[in-house]
Amino acid sequence: MQGEHGVQELRETDPRTIGPYQVLGRLGSGGMGEVYLAEARGGLRLAVKVVRAEHAEDRTFRARFRHEVRAAQTVGGAGTYTARVVDADTEAARPWMATEFVQGPNLRDAVLDRGPLPADTVRLLAAALAEALAAIHAKGLVHRDLKPSNILLAPDGPRVIDFGIVRALEGTALTRTGVVVGSVGYLSPEQIRNGAQVVPASDVFSLGAVLAYASGGREPFGEGQDSVVLLRILTGDVDLSAVPKEQLPLVEACLRDDPAARPTPAELVAAAGHSEASLREGLRPG
């Protein structure tokens, strides 16, 4: 999670520096590790994710984390709607990765605080997130964990964070027991059946669930125990009753069970009613 309003005070056990950066506060934590707000000497603010000690001790995790970070460093920059990876140390006792700090709430918190997004905003969001997926996929990455809390709403458009990094957890000693890696309500059917078969179209399914949440204000596959939610995804038991009619065709196309039947990111941009130029214009601050 990011945003100045979400910065928490450091605990006694938290680091005061990470690599060359001064740590200013806590931004959150998750299955991968802790996230801190840090600052470079020149004043640039960063979100630094520090891997949990138990993951750092796993050789498989380290190798995959190293590979995924290198790939992630090639993604980003102007117009990609992704948070750029600025620095990383994959050989540290606890590996870390620093991305540009994005000022703004995540999509999950925004919907919880203010309710479903307006139709025009959802169309812009759909096109921008499709552009982000195109940039990620072009580098040979699959996000694997696209969800509302991994989408930050900056004044000049959304930013997708944590792309590809969840793959480092797959197949490690901590997940070899068949535990599904990712946020269950946004996983594609093929991720549930066999995580090794994840393809770029898997992210498109997750995007469909994200857009259903953004436009309808509720989890499309409901809540409850993980096993129950996963079964709903596998059986196509989705509740889109809160999604406005004009958004339904796009959402339903993304949520098709067959990955090959889902639209590509480029098709999604067009389906959302935008070209690259109109998207830039629509997301211009002010």
Regions found by a protein language model. Name each.
Residues 1-285:
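Eukaryotic protein kinase
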